[in-house]
């Protein structure tokens, strides 16, 4: 959890926002997945948001569903994902690592065991996409027991009660949803969400990172804009996974394009 606090402190001192890429672990293969993640970090990623492939991903659009299918085709299992995570943490001791998950994978060997594994490999946060806040108590209790930040989604239509609950129980960062629906770069995020960011800040919530439909530098700038009213950073998934998908057969070109994309998105976080 402390890694997020350190990160936001350092970025605030530099007057920068956070740029956080999302990829599926093991896509398109375990070895290439590690190369991709090393490349994202080298290109300027401030933190990582990583998925463990799941067979029925309700919140994901076709791009991220296909990434899971590629990982499954390469024989990726949750166990292999934890091995990849341990390796990332060993190489990159300071970067915050977040998991974006579905509840079935957390339940599989017991909630407590799952968070214990996360702690062992150096994961900082877990967001469970299909668990609404009202049902999150057992997950967040296990997370905190093991020093893992429970992350909550703040939807664009959140009412005051939900904002207070998220502020009270969330740690690490708050996932600010640009819009309802499934993930996908073609579905642009709708702005502005400044009133939500204001309220979250008023209630001392963990810093807001805006995600869903963030696929170009101008959107990163927009999500951070409005001075103190903007989000603390942006998460981009589908646009990155599309680069992987288009270049599966040409890994060198893939890494070149990923470097270019992340460099441009990170540059947009600097005021």
Swiss-Prot record:
Q: Which Pfam families does the record cross-reference, listed alphabetically?
A: Trp_syntA
Q: Which reaction does it catalyse?
A: (1S,2R)-1-C-(indol-3-yl)glycerol 3-phosphate + L-serine = D-glyceraldehyde 3-phosphate + L-tryptophan + H2O
Tell me the domain of life: Bacteria
- Which top EC class is named for this enzyme in its record? lyase
Native organism: Yersinia pestis bv. Antiqua (strain Angola)
What are the coiled-coil residue ranges?
A: none
Task: Tell me the GO molecular function terms.
Answer: tryptophan synthase activity
Positions of the catalytic residues: 49, 60
Query: Which UniProt key words apply to this protein?
Result: Amino-acid biosynthesis, Aromatic amino acid biosynthesis, Lyase, Tryptophan biosynthesis
Keyword presence, Amino-acid biosynthesis: yes
Enzyme Commission number(s) of this protein = 4.2.1.20
Q: What is the name attached to this protein's record?
A: Tryptophan synthase alpha chain
| Function description | The alpha subunit is responsible for the aldol cleavage of indoleglycerol phosphate to indole and glyceraldehyde 3-phosphate.
């Amino acid at each position: 959890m402390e890694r997020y606090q350190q990160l936001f402190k350092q970025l605030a001192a530099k007057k920068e926002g956070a740029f956080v890429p999302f990829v599926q672990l093991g896509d398109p293969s375990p070895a290439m997945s590690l190369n991709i993640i090393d490349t994202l970090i080298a290109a300027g990623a401030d933190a990582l948001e990583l998925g463990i492939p799941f067979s029925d991903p309700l919140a994901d659009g076709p791009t991220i569903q296909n990434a899971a299918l590629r990982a499954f085709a390469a024989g990726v299992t949750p166990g292999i994902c934890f091995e990849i995570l341990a390796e990332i943490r060993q190489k990159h001791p300071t970067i915050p690592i977040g998991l974006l998950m579905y509840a079935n994978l957390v339940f599989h060997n017991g909630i407590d065991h799952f968070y214990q594994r996360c702690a062992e490999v150096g994961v900082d946060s877990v967001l469970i996409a299909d668990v609404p806040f009202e049902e999150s108590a057992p997950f967040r209790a296990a997370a905190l027991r093991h020093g893992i930040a429970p992350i909550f989604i703040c939807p664009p239509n959140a009412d005051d009660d939900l904002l207070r609950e998220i502020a009270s129980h969330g740690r690490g960062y708050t996932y600010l949803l640009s819009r309802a629906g499934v993930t996908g770069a073609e579905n642009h995020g709708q702005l502005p969400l400044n009133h939500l960011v204001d309220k979250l800040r008023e209630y001392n919530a963990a810093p807001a990172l805006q995600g869903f439909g963030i696929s170009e530098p101008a959107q990163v700038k927009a999500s951070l804009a409005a001075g103190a009213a903007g989000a603390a950073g942006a998460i981009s998934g589908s646009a990155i996974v599309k680069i992987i998908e288009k270049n599966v057969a040409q890994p060198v070109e893939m890494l070149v394009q990923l470097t270019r994309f992340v460099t441009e998105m990170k540059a947009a976080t600097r005021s």
